[in-house]
Amino acid sequence: MEFEHRPVLLAPTVDALLLADFAGKGAARSGRQDGAQADARAQRGVFVDGTFGRGGHSRELLRRLGPEARLVVFDKDPQAIAVANELAAGDARVTVVHGGFAAMREELAARGIESIDGVMLDLGVSSPQLDDAGRGFSFMREGPLDMRMDTTRGPTVADWLAQASVDEMREVIADYGEERFAFQVAKAIAARRATRPLRTTLELAECVASAVRTREKGQHPATRTFQALRIYINRELEELSRALASALELLAPGGRLAVISFHSLEDRMVKQCIAAAARPAVAHARLPLRESELPQPLYRSLGRVQADDEEIAGNARARSAVLRVAERTTEPLGADGAAAFVPAMRVPGEAAPARRGARRRPH
């Protein structure tokens, strides 16, 4: 069964990768690449779509790329990969990788690609995945409690809920769903599974609703819990962290990063990474150096874009979408590498990793 998918922020995302004078809200407006450089990238550049989905963004990008350009598309979803393979069969510029964008650096290296000219990520769950009850992402449709992006590997949400402790469930729901009734929800799940296992989405939604004491206007009481479980079972934030680090390492000078996020956890991570890489190192700030001798930022922020009223009217999912864009400068990475610019991740149940080489401003 085919499900309609409308790509969110389609034109702004592709513009962000290709237009020399692209600038979103809050963008730096000086020192960006010239039009000739941008045109050369469009004609012969290498681009990555880390979240192919049903290919809306990829098709628009291909329409605007030259015949010598190359596009590498990633997705964990077997259904998305089937669509991508059909596209690649008719367009020699397309290379398909069945896997997540977290492995971008390794997968590109295996194909002889050492640098790229642009990467776009459309985070979260897609409309076809939500609309397909059999995938288990929606609390509005009866389906198996799955939620895996890649249905060929890994435990389902039902598998994890059957064995997780109350503390583990509480921590995941609180951290990844920002649910203030996380403890009550975890206890309700534990009580329910003691009598019979949770097998379907509606069973879980009903269980969660019984534990959430107050209702947020316009939001189902299971929204935050479903988000948390999906993020956890697919390791979404951990994979985003790896992808942001890879982008910093792979992007050529003038190359662009364009990331669409749909909730505050993702957007905060992207925003913090761009902000950290857009600040010059300050270790030598008090030394008598000329400005040209000081380290420069790794990224130049090109701002953010949100959907306008017209797009939201035609696609309600666009309401919460935020596109953030950054441009790679000529400054080389330091000895600490890209990880120093990515926010430290704390996976529920594990200690927070130290952030190596984090640069601090002097007090």
Curated annotation (Swiss-Prot):
InterPro entries assigned: RsmH, SAM-dep_MeTrfase_MraW_recog, SAM-dependent_MTases_sf
GO biological process: rRNA base methylation
Binding site for S-adenosyl-L-methionine: G55, G56, H57, D75, D122, Q129
Compartments it resides in: Cytoplasm
GO CC field: cytoplasm
Pfam families xref list: Methyltransf_5 (PF01795)
Gene3D superfamilies in UniProt: Putative methyltransferase TM0872, insert domain, Vaccinia Virus protein VP39
Known EC number: 2.1.1.199
Purpose: Specifically methylates the N4 position of cytidine in position 1402 (C1402) of 16S rRNA.
Name of this chain's protein: Ribosomal RNA small subunit methyltransferase H
Phylogenetic classification of the source organism: Bacteria, Pseudomonadati, Pseudomonadota, Betaproteobacteria, Burkholderiales
Encoding gene per record: rsmH
